[in-house]
Swiss-Prot record:
SUPFAM superfamilies: Isocitrate/Isopropylmalate dehydrogenase-like (SSF53659). This is 3-isopropylmalate dehydrogenase. Substrate binds at R94, R104, R132, D217. It is an enzyme of class 1 (oxidoreductase).
């Protein structure tokens, strides 16, 4: 079987971290004997420069036909038109592909716990995933307005929107340590009451998964004081936005964190959580590990290459443990040197 992969290098450091990652993918495919077809398209700010839009119809159609999308990074101060920003392309892509679930792993190995801003004995062994609903909730609710003396946002969820994200979280927990924490604000919000009800209903289909309901304020505290208690966390859009950013600092650098966006079926999108960092673009300083770990997610979730994903993750964590890192992690290695060493593991 041959997989179709679309590469979207994007802006800033995106092209340099993705190009090295694609070279790794080629070596991994040769070792693990799978085939893929690769297409690359301009996306984000660079697409605005070339075509006047952050997402062309050709690029969108290519993405719709893909098994997986690998995205570098988008955005930067160069593109200031509020009606034609690079980020609009990503929002349109997510909506067109119905990517309603954002998956963000947070992992701290014994050898990397010293990088965390938290105490080592607190973070060591952290291995959690936050599943965030991505396309509904207060960010998309109507009516929404700002007037001179008042403003309104609307928080709305349907049972179908809740159930589909909850099932993705249950399936993920079922493959991991079988612990699911559902985060809401059930003591105050009507939408959270429905959320909790749906979680309890869906639980009947997953008898082996232990479910714990937690209020969002309590969860935000426990993420800092006892992150190792969590396996899979599922929550709505606003809470997930905040909690996933909070969790992302636990490993010690935004450059370490991968992410994925899933729909019910079809194409899945993989990207590091960091921005385009235009201040260090083309300076060979970018931390590539978030992009490389996003490839590992892609190998596992879209290409059915679990062994390859596990090996790649182990190699990255061994590099961190031995301080083969870029400056943001306290190392002295350039981006190109990291990729050279990574590729040598497959030669």
């Amino acid at each position: 079987m041959s997989y179709k992969i679309v590469a979207l290098p994007g802006d800033g450091i995106g092209p340099e971290i993705l190009s090295g990652t694609l070279e790794l993918l080629k070596l991994i495919s040769e070792k693990y004997h799978f085939e893929y077809h690769l297409e690359s398209h301009h996306f984000g700010g660079v697409s605005i420069d070339y075509y006047g839009t952050p997402l062309t119809n050709e690029t969108l159609q290519s993405c719709k036909n893909a098994d997986a999308i690998l995205l570098g990074a988008i955005g930067g101060p160069k593109w200031t038109d509020p009606n034609n920003r690079p980020e609009h392309g990503l929002l349109k892509l997510r909506k067109s592909l119905n990517l309603f679930a954002n998956i963000r792993p947070t992992f701290v190995t014994k050898g990397a716990s010293h990088l965390s801003p938290l105490k080592q004995d607190i973070v060591e062994g952290t291995d959690l995933v936050i599943v965030r609903e991505l396309t509904s909730g207060i960010y998309f609710g109507e009516p929404s307005y700002v007037k001179k003396t008042e403003a309104l946002d609307s928080l709305k969820y349907s049972s179908q929107e809740i159930e589909r994200i909850v099932r993705i979280a249950f399936n993920l927990a079922n493959r991991r340590r079988k612990k699911l924490t559902s985060v809401d604000k059930e003591n105050v919000l009507s939408s959270s009451k429905l959320w909790r009800q749906i979680v309890n209903d869906v639980k009947k289909d997953y008898p082996e998964v232990e479910v714990n309901h937690m209020l969002v304020d309590a969860c935000s505290m426990h993420l800092i004081t006892q992150p190792t208690q969590f396996d899979v966390i599922v929550t709505e859009n606003l809470f997930g936005d905040i909690l996933s950013d909070e969790a992302s600092v636990i490993p010690g650098s935004l450059g370490l964190s991968p992410s994925a966006s899933f729909g019910q079926t079809g194409t899945r999108l993989y990207e590091p959580i960091h921005g385009s960092a235009p201040d260090i673009a083309n300076e060979d300083k970018a931390n590539p590990f978030g992009m490389v770990l996003s490839l590992a997610l892609c190998l596992r979730e879209s290409l059915n290459q679990n062994d390859a994903a596990n090996e790649l993750e182990s190699i990255v964590y061994s590099f961190i443990q031995s301080n083969k890192t870029t400056a943001d992690l306290g190392g002295q290695y350039r981006t190109s040197k990291i990729f050279k060493l990574l590729k040598e593991k497959y030669l």
